[in-house]
């Protein structure tokens, strides 16, 4: 299965609590932090919810 490299590109300041929790669940903390996750429907759903905050690349 493919892997996704997810980078937090925008700050969480002023964002609603559900978006903050979603970013935290993805394992992202500070701006420009990067995580590599397996590509599955659950991760894709979380990325969709915060797509305006993150950058995603297939690895």
Swiss-Prot record:
Q: Which Gene3D superfamilies match?
A: Ribosomal protein L30, ferredoxin-like fold domain
Q: Does the keyword Ubl conjugation apply?
A: no
Ribonucleoprotein recorded as keyword: yes
Q: What GO CC terms are in its UniProt record?
A: cytosolic large ribosomal subunit
The entry's keywords: Ribonucleoprotein, Ribosomal protein
The record's annotation in InterPro entries points to:
Ribo_uL30_ferredoxin-like_sf, Ribosomal_uL30_bac-type, Ribosomal_uL30_CS, Ribosomal_uL30_ferredoxin-like
Q: Which domain of life is it from?
A: Bacteria
What family is reported? Belongs to the universal ribosomal protein uL30 family.
The protein's name? Large ribosomal subunit protein uL30
């Amino acid at each position: 299965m493919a892997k996704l490299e997810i980078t937090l590109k925008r700050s969480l300041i002023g964002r609603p609590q559900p978006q903050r929790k979603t970013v935290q669940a993805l394992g992202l903390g500070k701006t420009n932090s990067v995580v590599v996750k397996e590509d599955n429907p659950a991760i894709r759903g979380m990325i969709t919810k915060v797509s305006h905050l993150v950058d995603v690349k297939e690895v």
